[in-house]
């Protein structure tokens, strides 16, 4: 069995309780899946929290600015797209040799696509869908059946089935009342807890409900849920897998704000709970179209250029501003100058970047109260179809892909969510003559970080077999392990106040990243929203930033951006 590894210490995202077997599931038809975003999408702008779904920006009429963005993840690229649309000049610097950050992927020496994690697109990802439509990537999404599937030990399947023509909130009520993942008593107590939540207010007053949800940041979801009559069994069998999938931590450790933010959208928007996945790898089908849009608009990517130091000074009035950023690529070193600097990093990345003196400002110091969660992503390629449990003969043939085509949750393994990418993202992951490609996310990843690849792969292989006993006898042909030391920030109780605004006390320095202040959780959607917010701050400060450029010219002419030493001349284009 071949295997590969990638270690990344920080990245620059029935009734009556009786379970049923797979005969309740609809098998996938590999090439007949809806993909357009023009269908099966709720209008998120109607009766929705404005913080989550901001209106389109007004046309910018201020001075053109030269912007340097550190980080080519979703947050950085979202910022770049918004600024380029408003006529600014943008350069993006990325220390890796590929873009995408936590949603990045690359091809190894054997031609396998390696991802940083399992990427699922909830129907409430309005800002990300907006970006994808803008860059022409909307047709790259495959719509899955509108059901959330739980795979329990022994191959028992539980569901939250949202397939009801009446829509929200009735489809959600039906899903929770008829789920076979919980026993009747737990379902009843679950219904009581949700009925006593801000989710109900969201039906008539979404902004008020959003404020109520923010106010619950200082309590864990478990404490909130149990206080409202929910049961520990509901947490263990349903909500923990969901919490792990969303934030990589369990309900005892995740803020009630995070879970209830999602619940409020599921309750009010029919398609918010509808899942999509990319038709293939993120680098090809997500980052690729965004990169093309940026370069077509005149933006520039500079890969393998890392920021070593932020250089700054003070004006006569005491205002701090950046004079340049010291960049390096292998043994090459350059000084990059711009009108505006955006740090689109993750939590460990921004901690390394901020000058220690800036911690005198609470906005920067508070970042050090945030920590990332370790996560391990494992890929296992089989010589048959792991999730096909009804027909043993079909699971052994390699002429056509069969099995469960969706995101899958489980409460009975160290990986909370997983998918067979050969089914769910077939363009790059279905290989003729081979079988399932199980991609599983180990959360929390702490116990796995020090383990060697072979030990991790063997543990995951055994747990997959526990979930799918019918896969006994299938062999693992190939595997990969990706370790990320700090991924999403740990969204524990009381951490939301420490998330920084995109606008900082440093006049020409802005932040982007899913950890920054925005009403969604740390996620692809959160990263995209943070980029929109950062760009909005920059455009609203356009006149002031142009005035700062003039003042620097008057007070420190040696710090000017001159045509002979501009960024595009200093760095090779990619």
Swiss-Prot record:
Catalyzed reaction equations: 9,9'-di-cis-zeta-carotene + 2 a quinone = 7,7',9,9'-tetra-cis-lycopene + 2 a quinol
Recorded name of the encoding gene: ZDS1
Keywords: Carotenoid biosynthesis, Chloroplast, Chromoplast, FAD, Flavoprotein, NAD, Oxidoreductase, Plastid, Transit peptide
SUPFAM superfamilies: FAD/NAD(P)-binding domain
Keyword Chaperone assigned: no
PANTHER family, alphabetized: PROTOPORPHYRINOGEN OXIDASE (PTHR42923), ZETA-CAROTENE DESATURASE, CHLOROPLASTIC_CHROMOPLASTIC (PTHR42923:SF41)
Record has Nucleus as a keyword: no
InterPro entries listed in its UniProt record: Amino_oxidase, FAD/NAD-bd_sf, Zeta_caro_desat, Zeta_carotene_desat/Oxidored
EC number assigned by the record: 1.3.5.6
Biological process terms in GO annotation: carotenoid biosynthetic process
Pathway(s) per entry: Carotenoid biosynthesis; lycopene biosynthesis
Name recorded for this polypeptide: Zeta-carotene desaturase, chloroplastic/chromoplastic
Stated family: Belongs to the zeta carotene desaturase family.
Known cofactor(s): NAD(+); NADP(+); FAD
GO MF term set: 9,9'-di-cis-zeta-carotene desaturase activity
Disulfide bonds: none
